[in-house]
From Swiss-Prot:
SUPFAM superfamilies: L30e-like, N-terminal domain of eukaryotic peptide chain release factor subunit 1, ERF1, Translational machinery components. Heterodimer of two subunits, one of which binds GTP. InterPro entries: eFR1_2_sf (IPR042226), eRF1_1_Pelota (IPR005140), eRF1_1_sf (IPR024049), eRF1_2 (IPR005141), eRF1_3 (IPR005142), Peptide_chain-rel_eRF1/aRF1 (IPR004403), Ribosomal_eL30-like_sf (IPR029064). SMART domains: eRF1_1 (SM01194). Pfam families: eRF1_1, eRF1_2, eRF1_3. Belongs to the eukaryotic release factor 1 family. It is found in: Cytoplasm. Directs the termination of nascent peptide synthesis (translation) in response to the termination codons UAA, UAG and UGA. Its main location: cytoplasm. GO terms for cellular component: cytoplasm. Keywords: Cytoplasm, Protein biosynthesis. This is Eukaryotic peptide chain release factor subunit 1.
């Protein structure tokens, strides 16, 4: 596979990966809840539905629920329906991808707590769902997480060329053309040389036309285009050497050359060859996100090995570099367990300045992690707020001029990143001497540290 690791990820793709993480996080949160009785509501509204119709349906359900014999369960169901109706009133119109509403009374830490969550997914909801149960139903949200990357295919032999895309299970033929190339000639002498030259010219023109057509089909151009490939990767298939010549042709756009994932020898051309190429490229297509992840982490570890001073890792150094706006690519494990905890205390009747710590959930209940030396005295701090660090990154990474890259621990490189580097790191815009930065931070307050930034970059 020859995807260029230096090729920047488009903002649209980055936003999509963040939206996928947010959806996974929402699903995990919903699935962790246990309803108090059979009274929690799962409501999924696909685009095209009228909010007034959904509100009318909930009104009817309210009337039906009023006949529930159990007083406790009846009140819980009525309360959940009321919460759902109140949440719908916040929307003047249905969001383009539809709306998911989850509400009801759950059991959490031995207490009953009301939960109301409304969520607009990054992909359209397909079916209308209304369920009242003892748990939140997330099956239909999970369906949205199925791989929807779009891949391009160029199937090319000496008779025809087919260009197509594959997205999930949807196969779309974009273009199909035939060619009549001169056959090898059996004559000798000057005729042989002339026919060989004509044959080579015809093959060259054929490859040129295919390259030009591929450039126009697989790159979003024009006044409203992004000038980027419209596919995540390209598969080149064929029964002769045409695909190899195409992949190195100067006419074949560099932006497409950089995303060629695999070249496949197949027995057929046209649509039959397209189907065979899909089958033979199955493992490559399945692991494309993983391959991109491995390339990113390889770049990360190579910077460490070469001591370029353009890389950071661990929470302390990464946060420090992020606050300096030195981080170009913020790399985080998508299951990073740390929380960003805000702590304060009252000293001599005055509230102290907020202290930020990065703690595991288990550490947040241990007093030894909630102590801090303030004005020369060690004091016990109170938790004023906490947020999953990943959520804080999603909310704030743009403020520091960074891109946000999620990685998993499904590869050897990902496992090493999580266990060896704490699951968090970054590629830097400029060199930073982190040892000098740490020493300087200990000797200076934050303001003077930022003023003298040039001392260690």
């Amino acid at each position: 596979m020859s995807i260029n690791p230096d090729a920047p990820q488009s903002n649209g793709e980055q936003e999509r990966q963040i939206a996928i993480w947010q959806l996974k996080r929402t699903i995990e949160k919903l699935e962790s809840y246990t309803g108090s009785g059979t009274s929690v509501i799962s409501l999924l509204i696909p685009p095209g539905e009228q909010l007034s119709s959904v509100t009318g349906m909930l009104t009817n359900e309210y009337g039906t629920a009023s006949n529930i014999k159990s007083r406790v369960n009846k009140n819980a169901v009525l309360s959940a329906i009321t919460s759902a109706m109140s949440r719908l009133k916040l929307y003047n119109r249905l969001p383009p991808n539809g709306l998911a509403v989850y509400c009801g009374e759950i059991e959490e830490d031995g207490k009953n707590t009301k939960v109301v969550i409304d969520y607009t997914p990054y992909k359209p909801i397909s079916n209308f769902i209304y369920l009242c149960d003892s748990k939140f139903h997330t099956e239909h949200l999970r369906e949205l997480l199925t791989n929807d990357d779009t891949f391009g295919f160029i199937i090319m032999d000496g008779k025809e060329t087919l260009m197509a895309t594959l997205s999930g299970t949807v196969r779309t033929i974009l273009d199909r053309s035939t060619v009549d190339l001169p056959k090898k000639h059996g004559r000798g002498g000057q005729s042989s040389v002339r026919f060989a030259r004509l044959r080579e010219e015809a093959r060259h023109n054929y490859v040129r036309k295919v390259a030009e057509r591929a450039n126009s089909l697989f790159i979003s151009s024009g006044p409203t285009g992004t000038n980027k490939p419209i596919v995540s990767g390209l598969i080149l298939g064929g029964s002769a050497d045409f695909k190899n010549v195409l992949s190195t042709s100067a006419i074949f756009d560099q932006r497409l050359q950089s995303i060629v994932m695999k070249q496949i020898d197949i027995n057929y051309g046209g649509e039959q060859g397209f189907n065979q190429a899909i089958e033979m490229a199955g493992d490559t297509l399945k692991d494309v996100k993983l391959i991109q992840e491995v390339k990113l982490l390889t770049e990360f570890t190579e910077n460490i090995a070469k001591d370029t001073k353009r890389v950071c890792f661990g929470i302390t150094d990464t946060i420090r570099c992020l606050e300096m706006s030195a981080v170009e690519k913020l790399i985080v494990w998508d299951d990073l367990p740390y929380h960003r905890v805000t702590l304060q205390c009252v000293i001599n009747g005055e509230t102290s300045a907020p202290v930020i710590k990065y703690l595991l959930k288990s550490q947040m209940s241990n007093p030894k992690y909630l102590r801090e030396v303030i004005n020369g005295e060690e004091v016990q701090l109170d938790i004023m707020g906490d947020q999953l660090l990943l959520e804080w990154f999603v909310d704030n990474y743009k403020n520091y001029g960074a891109s946000l890259e999620f990685i998993t621990n499904r590869s050897a490189e990902g496992t090493q990143f999580c266990s060896g580097f704490g699951g968090i790191g970054g590629l830097l815009r400029w060199q930073v001497d982190l040892v000098e930065a740490a020493r300087f931070m200990q000797e200076s307050d934050e303001d003077s540290f930022m003023d003298d930034l040039e001392d260690f970059i």
